[in-house]
Regions:
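Short, hydrophobic beta-strand segments that form beta-sheet elements in well-ordered domains
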Residues: 24-31, 77, 184-187, 203
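N-terminal anchoring/stem segment of glycosyltransferases
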Residues: 1-58, 69-73, 210
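Catalytic core and acceptor-binding pocket of nucleotide-sugar-dependent glycosyltransferases
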Residues: 127-227
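Short, charged, surface-exposed secondary-structure boundary motifs
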Residues: 10-11, 53-61, 108-115, 212-215
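GT-A fold catalytic core of metal-dependent nucleotide-sugar glycosyltransferases
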Residues: 47, 59-130, 134
């Protein structure tokens, strides 16, 4: 998802994908100016007018609704533009699980964190196109007011999760089962919530939503002309 103030961040993200010959991506342009800029540069993009607020707690229903519409067409892997692919992270996917999520130890949202001691980050998350997964989307989208999609998704999972449906796998991964949906939560290193780490597939540093993403990514060694 991209607005015009994120244009250079989007180009940096695509640069890293191109290094791994990844071409089956699409950036959702939320305004015509952004769409035209990306399209002129042969960057895969789709125009869906909308807005995402740069704060936690609300303003993210548009993203979740758009992901649901895309999910109807096939499996999707949603990735924030400041989550930089150092390796081909498609290798983290499998055919067994319905949702594969990156792990967040930052404490948001608090309800899920208190229950699980971690949360699932919407900044890198795979959804399989099947009825059970779409049913979760539909239940969350029944809420009429705007919301923070990471909060609503995590809260839905813990509200419907039985304690005996939490498993540990090798490499410190977690497996959850909710509503006949198998959720795999990756370990901290594979999608790393920190600065450049050569051991990681993806580095998704913790950056305040109001911060200048370009400046922060450069500081953290995740800009295309810094490595």
């Amino acid at each position: 998802f991209c607005s015009f103030d994120y244009i250079e961040v989007a180009e940096n993200w695509v640069y890293h994908l191109n290094k791994h010959n990844i071409t089956n991506y699409v950036i959702i342009a939320m305004d015509t100016e952004t769409y035209n800029y990306l399209d002129d540069r042969k960057i895969n993009t789709k125009l869906i007018h909308g807005k995402i607020l740069k704060r936690s707690g609300t303003g993210w229903k548009f993203r979740f609704q758009t992901m649901y519409e895309l999910l109807k067409e096939g499996n999707i892997l949603h990735c924030d533009l400041d989550a930089i692919w150092l390796k081909d992270a498609r290798n983290l996917l499998d055919d067994e699980h319905d949702i594969i999520a990156s792990k967040d130890d930052g404490g948001w949202p608090p309800k899920a964190y208190e229950h699980l001691n971690f949360t699932m980050c919407m900044g890198w998350i795979f959804f399989r196109n099947n009825d059970n997964v779409k049913n979760i989307f539909e239940k969350i989208l029944e809420k009429e007011s705007d919301f923070d999609d990471q909060e609503e998704f995590n809260d839905y999972i813990v509200d419907n999760l039985k304690d005996n449906n939490i498993y540990y796998k090798n490499e410190n991964e977690r497996i959850l089962e909710v509503d006949n949906v198998k959720v795999r939560v990756l370990n901290e290193t594979d999608v790393f919530r920190g600065n450049y780490n050569e051991a990681s597939y993806v580095c998704h540093p913790l950056i305040k939503k109001q911060a200048n993403k370009q400046v922060q990514l450069k500081k953290r060694g995740l800009w295309y002309n810094e490595k």
